[in-house]
């Protein structure tokens, strides 16, 4: 997210968290994020200055009405009126982080060299809960074969890197060689 997007998104994300239905806020934000990530046409339509605000409202109502809380739809209408709907992705991402924080949910991004089994995933979640004292851990898993073996975890500002790739880098640094 660019610094301009962050500057624009933060106040709107704060406002959304204030007015949102507390029971559905995380589901609503996940629904918005999923719709935006899966539809490049939707992203283009709401970011296009040639598409009128009324047309953008119609698009949003047709996609989200009935799928998210009424206050969430109204909030997106306000974004259209203010000419800020193009920042919906950044606003949703920022608001989701705030909602997770309020619900004592930590987001952890995990890259592993192979797909983790359910037992490994559960063990990792338990360790991360103990480490962060969070009530819940939400994992975003991806496979990165360049790690050779092991995994990397980013949770908040902390990074845990147990990958073979990292160990080789450390070893080469110790030996004075360079590894590409």
Curated annotation (Swiss-Prot):
It is a peripheral membrane protein. Pfam families: OSCP. One of its GO terms (cellular component) is proton-transporting ATP synthase complex. GO terms for molecular function: proton-transporting ATP synthase activity, rotational mechanism. Keywords: ATP synthesis, CF(1), Chloroplast, Hydrogen ion transport, Ion transport, Membrane, Plastid, Thylakoid, Transport. It is found in: Plastid, Chloroplast thylakoid membrane. Gene3D superfamilies: N-terminal domain of the delta subunit of the F1F0-ATP synthase. InterPro entries: ATP_synth_OSCP/delta_N_sf, ATPase_OSCP/d_CS, ATPase_OSCP/dsu. F(1)F(0) ATP synthase produces ATP from ADP in the presence of a proton or sodium gradient. F-type ATPases consist of two structural domains, F(1) containing the extramembraneous catalytic core and F(0) containing the membrane proton channel, linked together by a central stalk and a peripheral stalk. During catalysis, ATP synthesis in the catalytic domain of F(1) is coupled via a rotary mechanism of the central stalk subunits to proton translocation. This protein is part of the stalk that links CF(0) to CF(1). It either transmits conformational changes from CF(0) to CF(1) or is implicated in proton conduction. F-type ATPases have 2 components, F(1) - the catalytic core - and F(0) - the membrane proton channel. F(1) has five subunits: alpha(3), beta(3), gamma(1), delta(1), epsilon(1). CF(0) has four main subunits: a(1), b(1), b'(1) and c(10-14). The alpha and beta chains form an alternating ring which encloses part of the gamma chain. F(1) is attached to F(0) by a central stalk formed by the gamma and epsilon chains, while a peripheral stalk is formed by the delta, b and b' chains. Belongs to the ATPase delta chain family. This is ATP synthase subunit delta, chloroplastic.
